[in-house]
């Protein structure tokens, strides 16, 4: 095998990577963009050139002989940004994990180390590849040494060997030093000969071979060139000397020490995890191929479960079961199971088809047997049509990973988890099925391919669970995981399967009403504008508003004028057409999203909507929902509230709606321990009225609805980390006035200010914030050198503990209400959660008991100084409960 050496100019490449890539941080807030860029370049170079040996040369801070020769050498260079400086040691540490040789020496630059090592390697029969962003290294090119100059950041390189230098510059690589001597180098502050550029320099060197040759033949020169050389010949010689790379640096090294490939892959993986380089793990595997001795493989056997009784006996002994259900697409209420894959040890994996599902009913529904898996909510729902309730959902790796890192850019798929924990490449769902209209369904897959994919999942659960448990324990989130998040999986599965009834007739009526309103608004808008146009076209609307009606231009886009909601809000006072356009947009959205949208997803069997509840989407811990997104039904306008009329109770039932009152402010009072705010809640004062008296210096009798509304905006603005500018925009008041509001607020609620400041301070140190229940949210933006991102990070740091704690409380309440309804064997069902609100579809004869249970469990979900308060209402529709 040919001996190939890659030698990298460490300072040059990390510097280029830093400026080429956007700001990046790991979970601890360490800047990582330069390390990431360097590593991707390293992988690319290894992949293309297949080196047997690698070394990285770094500059040292100590002055070199060049500084002694010329004091102004590299003078005027910008100071290295701190954001780059802090990345050098972590990069060197990563190179050590790769067992990649590093060389640095006082008095010499990386260029000189590269020059020396490349010479020694060439003499030893190596093919050498120098990677740098500095064209000075072109002088080192030869038949066996190729200089790779990076371009476009670090993404691409340009190759220079002896022949290509000769072709491009019409000179030899060593003559490139003479060119530098003549034309200088601004980046290194090498003066050269003033007035001599690249074109003239090349011409002179072609004629006289070198700087010395030009000086010896100075009389042959003419005009201004002769004068320039004559006046600056010492400068030219000195510039050449400084530009010359030393090739005999006194360093002791053995080429054997530069061998690449003998490294502990697991150590590299751990370092990637610390740096947050999950995406590079798959490239690490591709880099090494199957030959890497450290490669981890999932190990399993797949077979059909023939002896069900023996399996039941074994699972009852072990009290643990890993499972994954594969189902075909179909109605949520119908039997759609194709296969159930089962394992006791993660290695021996069995499967049954639909015909045997009910034979394992006792295993599935046993509360004594812990169930482990991935996306267990889907498994719970799949079994419900068979009259089976999957009990004791103990460990779901997607939920665990979400708790460990709620800000992950991955979707918590098995493929992402396998890569992170095992550096193992398994197919993602998209890779297995494809995407878009050409995507396959599970029942269209070859059984071998399907079974291997599902078995990978089961084996993965077994392999990563211990690591995840250790992380949850270290992060003090075991209780949150086992007592809240895992019981919640069943609750959400239950709610999803049960759904909420929809009055289809009422919904159609609402659609007719909306369409009539849309037509009327169109007529009004056309009349006000004096012509018909496409209101939904930002371009046409912009032309009407800003060219025809001459309204002030607030913001421009690449294609014209911005007409977004923020712009329209600023134009409200300028023309009556603005309110009409805003109303038109609201009704069009309501009609398309909640009338046409809901009509399309009403289940034909149940007449209900079965929304999907998502547990691993938001960074704060809140539950979200899709198809439809019930969290986003507008409630501020009556027209939006009307949507709630279509959500109704089943026959002989009522909806019991229980909504936490100001839960986030109560959490804020608890976490800050602000006596003023705690007292207000303890004495059942209206907190917004209380805040109005504190902020506006008025008595409670003097608090008008407008002042209370402003105080409410201040209260929640503080919770969401709103700035004085944001508050001024919301309340349409001067910036100075908004600033005074916030200052008054913090003067009266001083402990809240202390709490906010301490939260940000701790977040900057730790890289994350925590809720009352130890849920973490990492905030790398706090370490950003971008002012806007940093401020956004501060707002997130202030808000996440409050909103996250409120989310934890509603989850605890959901679990407790669900359990209590089950314990009492009630027919009433918890069917919906929206923000701080729970809805129970209640059988009439159980109404009083359900009201009592819901209030009791919600108000006592957690024990805190500030009592939780619940607004509880009953109605036939969701609308009637408000």
What is the predicted role of each segment?
Residues 5-6, 10, 16-55, 71-72, ...:
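Conserved RNase H-like, two-metal-ion catalytic cores of nucleic-acid enzymes
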Residues 341-346, 406-407, 412-435, 453-460, ...:
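Function-dense linear segments that define catalytic or interfacial modules
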Residues 519-523, 527-579, 747-795, 799, ...:
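C-terminal polymerase-core module
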Residues 2-131, 135-159, 235-238, 244-252, ...:
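Noncatalytic, basic helical substrate-engagement surface that gates or grips nucleic-acid strands
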Residues 2, 51-55, 89, 98-100, ...:
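Non-catalytic nucleic-acid-binding/docking modules located in mid-to-C-terminal regions
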Residues 155-156, 162-180, 297, 335-472, ...:
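Active-site-proximal helix-loop-helix substrate-binding element of RNase H-like nuclease domains
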Residues 440-443, 497, 610, 616-618, ...:
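Conserved catalytic core of nucleic-acid polymerases
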Residues 232-355, 437-638, 654, 664, ...:
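Conserved "right-hand" nucleotidyltransferase catalytic core of DNA-directed polymerases
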